[in-house]
Amino acid sequence: MKFGYTIVYVPDVEASIRFFEDAFGFSRRFLDESGDYGELDSGATTLAFASRELAHSNCEGGYQFCSPQQQPLGIEIALVTDDVPKAHAKALAVGATEHAPVQKKPWGQVVSYVRCPAGTLVELCTPVGQ
């Protein structure tokens, strides 16, 4: 078995893909013509977005959706970069909100946290051990 996808359920798939393109430099791999599903070219593990309508059809018992008006869910998307302050500033410039400023952890890693316009929590971090 291998880890293949992280799928984030959002109110607007195309807007979420566009945000990740503008904020973090990812390229769009695919956007379904219905607009209900799309993927970014994000390396070995695919980062994908699906509509809340698709989530409802996949999760018959319901699910907890993410919203910028609520506390973040207990999960994050961690993006590794050599320049956290620059990535943090760029994300804020294109619509992210700051959840935690850039800081250096006791083990030497530099991290910050932003929230996407749809409410998803994103950690920006240097590689561990550098």
Model-derived segments and spans:
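Conserved beta-strand-loop-alpha-helix junction that forms the acyl-donor binding cleft
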Residues: 10-13, 82, 106
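Vicinal oxygen chelate
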Residues: 1-5, 27-79, 86-115, 126-130
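N-terminal amphipathic/basic helix or basic patch
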Residues: 1, 8-11, 15
